[in-house]
Amino acid sequence: MKSQYFTEEHELFRQSVRQFVQKEILPYGNQWETEEKISRDLFLKLGEQGFLGINHEEAYGGTKSDIFYTCAYLEELAKSSYAGVCAAVSVHQYMATNHIAEAGTHELKERFLRPSIEGKKVGAIAITEPFGGSDVQSMRTTAVRDGDHYIINGSKTFITNGHFCDFVVVACKTDANAGINGISLIVIERGTPGFSSTQLKKIGWHSSDTGELAFDNVKVPVENIVGKEGMGFFYIMESFQIERLVAGILGIGGGEQCLEETLKYMNEREAFGRQIKKFQVLRHEMVQLYTELEAGKQMTYNACWLVQNGEIPVKESSMVKLYMTELSNKIVDKCLQMFGGYGYMEDFPIARAYRDARVGTIVGGTTQIMREILSKIIIDDVRYKKVYSNPEEIKSSAVSENKTAVEKTWGNPQTAKEIILSIPLRIKKEKASDYSTVFQFDISGDNGGQYTLIVNNGNAKVEEGLQGTPECVVTTDAKVYEDIELGRMDPTMAFMGGQIRVTNIGAMMQFAKFFHRI
C-alpha cells in the first residue's frame, strides 16, 4: 500500500531490520530475559549494520537518515516481542547519545558518540532520582566545580542500561540556588572512582538491565560537560519529545505484533465446534483494537513528520506518548484475554508482552504528566521554543520573560506576601465578570502568613487572616510558593511531590484561568 511517509527505500531498509531481528534477536531473546541483560555482541552487530547511526551525523559514523527510517527500525525491533531489548537499544541510541550529538563538543563526540554508533560503547542517561521522578527540577545530585573538575555526589534510580553501560550522561545541579537554570549534563565513565551501580529487579523488561547509581565524590573533568553549564534542564525538556515519539513508534510495532499473534491463535483455537475468530463479540473486539492502533499510528507519523520538517512538536509528541502507551496496555490486556488460560502462561509471548507494556505509562513521563503538559498547551496557551539552537535565548527567557510587562502593571512582587497582595491587580476583569470565589492561603516560613482572597463578580480583594468559608485552601511554604509563582518551579511537580497542598484542585484550575501569571 502506498504511503505518504514511506518510500521504497524505507521499505527495503525495513526488510533488512526484519532479517536482522530474525537472525540476531529471536534466537537469543529468551536467554537474555533469563540473564536480565542483552549480549554486548548485539550492540556490535547493530553497529556493524549501521543501524545505531541512522539518527546521527555522518561526521561521526552515522547516516543522518530521515526520521521515517527510525520508524521502520524501531517498529521492527518491537515486533521481536522483546520490549527489554527495545528499551536498552533505544535509550542508548536516542536518549543517552542524543544530548552528546546535539550539544557535545567535538572531543566528546569522538570519545563517546563515535564508539556508540559503532556499538563499541553502550550509554545510559540518568535523570530520575529516588526522591523525584517526573519532577526533574527537584533533583539533589550535585556537581561542584573544583578547578578543572566537577565533584559529583548523589544518586539516580530506574536507569536503563545503568548497570551495563560504559558511560552515563548524568543530570546534576551545578548551581543549587539557580532552580532550573542550575542543572547541567555531565558524562561519567564506568570505572571512575566513586561511581557504583546496583541492578534492580523488575516485573517486566527483563532483558534490559535497570540500575540504581551512586556517586560518592566522583571527580570528572570539566570537559565532560555536555553543552553549556546550566542548560541541562532545557536540553532534557527538548529531548523528551524524541523519547515520547520513540515510545509511540515502539507501541506501533509491539501492538501490531500482539494483534497478529492473537489473530493467528484465534485461527487455530476452536470452541463449541468452530474457530473462536467466528464469534462476533471477539471479532468486533479485534477490529476495534486495529482501528485504535491505526489512529495512533497516523498520529505518531504526523508528529514524526513535524520533527522531520524542523518543528519541536511538544503537543503532538505528548499526545502520542499519552495515547500509544495507554493503548498498548489495552491491546495486551484484550489480547491476553483472547488466549484464555494460555495467555497467562510464560510459554506464550503474550504473557511477556503483558508484563512489559505496563511500564509504558510511567517511563518517559507518566500519563498524568502528559495530560498536564497538554493542558498547559491547549488551555493555558503555553508555547515552547527550540533549545539546542538558541540556548542563551531560552535560558534568559526562563528568568525574565514578561518581566517588563509585569513591572508596569502590578509592580515586581518577589515575596510570598507581595505576590498574594498583587493577586487583585492581576485579575482578568472581563473574563472574570461572572466569577466569584473565596480562597485561603496558609503560607508558612519567612514572608508567609495567612490570607483570604475574596472574588465577587470580577472584583477581588485580599484580607489578612483566614476568614469565611473557602472554596479552596492552599497550604505551602513561602519559598515553594515564591518559586511556583515566579516560574522557578513547576506547580504540577510541586503538587505531586507534596510541596504544596490544595483542597480543591478543580477550583484551583478554574481560578488560574482568571488571573495573569507574574
Name what the model sees in each region.
Residues 141-144, 453:
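A structural signal for short hydrophobic beta-strand segments in well-ordered beta-sheet cores
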Residues 138, 191-221, 466:
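Flexible, small-/acidic-enriched active-site or ligand-binding loops
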Residues 214-238:
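A short, charged helix-loop
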